[in-house]
Structure formats: structure tokens, C-alpha cells
Amino acid sequence: MIHTRALSPALGVEVTGVENLLDETVISRCLEALTWRGVLLIRGLHLDDEAQLAFSRRLGTVLAPAGKEIFKISLDPAVQPSAEYLKSTFHWHIDDTTNEVPAKATMLTARHVAMTGGGTEFASTYAAFEALPEQEQKRYEQLRVVHSFEAAQRLTHPDPSEQEVAAWRRLRSHETSLVWQRRDGRRSLVIGATADHIVGMDPGESRAILDELLEWTAQERFRYTHEWAVDDVVIWDNTGMLHRALPYDPASRRTMHRTTIAGEEAWG
């Protein structure tokens, strides 16, 4: 029998008692939990890549070219050639803010974990927005934000070369509402490392607001910290959960296998 347990007051749920991961009831409960709790944890599944893909495909359409559905997250360039770019994931961020349609969800399975550190933190931008005073909610609903790859990379490379900046700027930026209201009526903040500036606002004031909102959302009451064990599976609502990796030894073998579920609704 399937059971669920809250991982923190505002977000996160652990699902236990799963015998057949592809069972329709299991899939339905997982999707429901993901919608209302944002982060879903299942332990001890021992998924290989094939099983992870099968599970991911039951949750939605896997967002990747055929044969490249599994993305390895590691700071070892021999494992992940893009390891240098992954250093920006130590900052709070939401994936796909520079795309027209964000990914619906992300799934990680832990293949190797760090001896110390290396956890993943999540913060609910739904809960953070709902806790704001009504006057502030109304103000922020009128604002729009430009997101860029460059903004995130400058956090880890504050003194980049001209070549690095040129490479970052070749990637698209995207403008979104600061507050995204979905078709189902739920509202969340679209903030994080990629948030470059608020449209039409003085740069100093813009940065102050974005930093204040990030600090507000990262409060403990809106946050869940996951300490990884091998074979843990964590799935999260990519559109409403900020996330970041916690520091760990770059020489660690920490490796996560990621699949991404395609979204169905464009940013506001």
C-alpha cells in the first residue's frame, strides 16, 4: 500500500510502499503529490537508466533527443564535459527560464554521493508568494523580468573574459512575468540566478527587489534540504521550486542522472 509523509511544512513528500513503479495508481499518486507538494522523494528503488526512463515517460514526455535522455550531473569533466557550467547550480535557480515553455518536472537519481556536503535544497516559490502581504503581491504582479544564461554564469565567474561573455550572450534570453499565474490559478515567483533585471526599472532598484525576493523565498519555512543516499529518486516541479546544490569536494564522485519532463504551459 502506498503511503506519503510530508518532508517539511511547505513542500516535499516521501512516497513509500511502492511495489510497481509503473502502476497506474502509483503514477497518479505521484503526479498528484508533485502538483501539491512540489518535491517528491522515493528511496531504495535501485533504478538503472532504462527504468528511470520508463518511469519518466509515464510522468510525461521526456525532453531530450533520442539516445541522450539521461544527463549526467558531475563536476568531473571526464564524466560531464559541461562540468564548468554546472558550478552555477550552487546558486538558487529555476531551470528553463530562458525557454518559451519551461520543463514540467526534473528527476534525479543518485548514483554516487559525496562523503560530505552535496545535498540539494528546494524552496517553494508558490508558498513564498502566498505569504507576501497583499499589497506587495499586487505590485509584483505588474512587473516583468529578463532571464539570461549570462546572469547565472556571472555569479560563479565575476570577472569573465570577452570570449566567455560573447559565448554566454549567444544563448537566448527570455522575458517572463515576475509572478506567473498558471491556468489552474496558482501563482509563483519566477526568480533565481538567471533573473538579470526587471524591465523598465533602475538597475539598482531592480537588483534590490530581485535579491530581496530571493532572500524571502529561501527562508527555512519555505525550504526543504535533501541529503542524498545512493539510489534516492527525487522529482520536483521545475516551474515552482527554486533549487540549488550544496557545496561538496569537486574531487568527489558525486553523480546524479537526470531526466527532464517536457512542460505544457508557456511562461506568463
Tell what function each PLM region has:
Residues 2-233, 238-268:
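Non-heme Fe(II) oxygenase catalytic core, chiefly the N-lobe of the double-stranded beta-helix
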